[in-house]
Amino acid sequence: MSFKFGKNSEKQLATVKPELQKVARRALELSPYDFTIVQGIRTVAQSAQNIANGTSFLKDPSKSKHITGDAIDFAPYINGKIDWNDLEAFWAVKKAFEQAGKELGIKLRFGADWNASGDYHDEIKRGTYDGGHVELV
C-alpha cells in the first residue's frame, strides 16, 4: 500500500534537516502502517514544557535534538486515528525507519530502543520509552 504525508506532516518535516526528511519519506514507503509526523523542530521553551508535563525524561531542555532539527516524533495513523497505546504499530514504523536509515546510509537513534537492544520492553521498564522519537546520530 502506498501512503502519502498530509499537510501537517509536510509542515513538520520542513522544519528538520534534509537527511531526516529523506529517511521519513523512505520509511513511509516501507512502513506497513500510515503514520503522521507529530513534531519536528521545537524551541527550548517547548522542550522545558514537555519536561514539566512529564512527556520528556530529559533533565536539560537545551539537550533536545528537536531544537536543532535533528529529531522528529511520528505516530502510526490507523483507521483514521492515532492509537498511542498500540506499541506494536509504533515498533513496526520504527523498523521501517531503521530500514530506511540503513538503505540511505543515515545513522539514527530511536526512542523506542535507546540502548539498541532490539526490544522496547526494557525502555518501558526504565521509564525511557519514547516510541515515536527518531533522531540523527
Swiss-Prot record:
Q: What Gene3D superfamilies does this protein map onto?
A: 3.30.1380.10
> InterPro entries annotated for this entry?
Hedgehog_sig/DD-Pept_Zn-bd_sf (IPR009045)
Set out the biological process GO terms recorded for this chain's protein: cell wall organization; defense response to bacterium; viral release from host cell by cytolysis
UniProt note: pH dependence: Optimum pH is 8.5.
Bridged cysteine pairs (disulfide): none
Q: What is the required cofactor set for this protein?
A: Zn(2+)
Q: Does the keyword Cell wall biogenesis/degradation apply?
A: yes
Family label: Belongs to the peptidase M15C family.
Q: Specify the protein name.
A: L-alanyl-D-glutamate peptidase
Its source organism is: Escherichia phage T5
Q: What is the lineage of its organism?
A: Viruses, Duplodnaviria, Heunggongvirae, Uroviricota, Caudoviricetes
